[in-house]
From Swiss-Prot:
Keywords annotated in UniProt: NADP, Oxidoreductase
GO MF, any single term: GMP reductase activity
Record: active site: 174
A GO cellular component entry from the record: GMP reductase complex
Alphabetical list of NCBIfam families matching this protein: GMP_reduct_2, PRK05458.1
Similarity section: Belongs to the IMPDH/GMPR family. GuaC type 2 subfamily.
PROSITE patterns per UniProt: IMP_DH_GMP_RED
Gene3D superfamilies for the chain: Aldolase class I
The UniProt record lists the keyword Ligase: no
SUPFAM superfamilies given in the database record: Inosine monophosphate dehydrogenase (IMPDH)
Coiled-coil ranges (or none): none
rRNA-binding listed as a keyword: no
The protein's name: GMP reductase
Name of the gene: guaC
Length: 325
């Protein structure tokens, strides 16, 4: 199959049919709900916390709460529902996670979304968890991942997943491709294309997005939602303290498989970065929406799916997604 990534692709414009990009609709239906843009901040401890989840839900954006405060997830679901907001949580596949699903079922606390969040999601452990969630909480929209092949997408969909998350190691804070030799780093966009062709349900593109134009490219090649970490790191609302260095402001960003997340140096496939402070997350989200509106206007449409119909050219290839390692 052709191998390419975000920086290797340029989309080819079609005739514009709108007078202003403000006419363009970027909304996406994903599961039971519709959101302003097809973007979700990564479910990482340096990106999302409960306060930001509340803000995103109130303002029409999708979110997925991370799974690293294991004992707080039941209360989180209750708190979100008490506020009249949707609940979206992450789970792993260890035995305690089965107990969590059972507890949610017993208390009739049914989150609208559950994401099974595993580095290598093409596994029996994930398939078993999908089946358990669907048995205990049949109304939940289950996102399963992460995977990188059409075969994995088919298996997880057949097990009952409502969406699959595609991306093995292309993230800015991820070094899986260097530590293991495996992954979709350098061909993430081609992996999305291959997985989307095999899928009958939505695909979440996870990792490797470095610029707002990459969102449009993800949609073009079959994604319904884009999970983004590094572009959302460093805002007022993201967790962590502002650090000053040489007169400039930064915030910490680390991968979910880094030693900083794990608390020990064992099976480490993530790293820690200092990213520039970016101010308010609302400004970043608004810019993403405006850039996506412009992209759709270049595609010759008024709605998101117009991007699926455009032609493209392959210009070059690089394994590092533009990162300086």
């Amino acid at each position: 199959m052709p191998v390419f990534d975000y920086e290797d692709i340029q989309l080819v414009p079609n005739k514009c049919i709108v007078k202003s990009r403000s006419e363009v609709n970027t909304k996406v239906k994903f599961g039971p709900m519709t959101f302003k843009i097809p973007v979700v901040p990564a479910n990482m401890q340096t990106i999302i916390d409960e306060n930001l989840a509340v803000w995103l839900a109130k303002n029409g954006y999708f979110y997925i709460m991370h799974r690293f405060y294991e004992n707080e997830r039941v209360d989180f679901v209750k708190n979100m529902h008490d506020k009249g907001l949707f609940a979206s949580i992450s789970v792993g596949v260890k035995p305690a996670e089965y107990d969590l699903i059972d507890e949610l079922s017993q208390k009739n606390l049914v989150p609208e979304y559950i994401t099974i969040d595993i580095a290598h999601g093409h596994s029996d452990t994930v398939i078993n968890m999908i089946k358990h969630i669907k048995h205990k909480l049949p109304g939940v929209f289950v996102i399963a991942g992460n995977v990188g092949t059409p075969e994995a997408v088919r298996e997880l969909e057949n097990a009952g997943a409502d969406a699959t998350k595609v991306g093995i190691g292309p993230g800015k804070a991820c070094i899986t491709k260097l530590k293991t030799g495996f992954g979709t780093g350098g061909w993430q966009l081609a992996a999305i294309r291959a997985c989307a062709k095999a899928a009958s349900k939505p695909i979440v593109a996870d990792g490797g997005i470095r610029n707002n134009g990459d969102i449009a490219k993800s949609i073009r090649f079959g994604a319904s939602m884009c999970m983004i970490g590094s572009l959302f790191a460093g805002h007022d609302e993201t967790p962590g303290d502002i650090i000053e260095k040489d007169g400039k402001k930064f915030k910490t960003y680390f991968g979910s498989a880094s030693q900083y997340q794990k608390g020990e140096y064992k099976n480490v496939e993530g790293k820690k970065l200092l990213l520039p402070y970016k101010g308010k997350i609302a400004d970043t989200l608004r810019e993403m929406q405006e850039d996506l509106q412009s992209a759709i206007s270049y595609a010759g449409g008024k709605e998101l799916l117009a991007l699926r119909k455009v032609d493209y050219v392959i210009v070059k290839n690089s394994i590092y997604n533009g990162d300086m390692l």
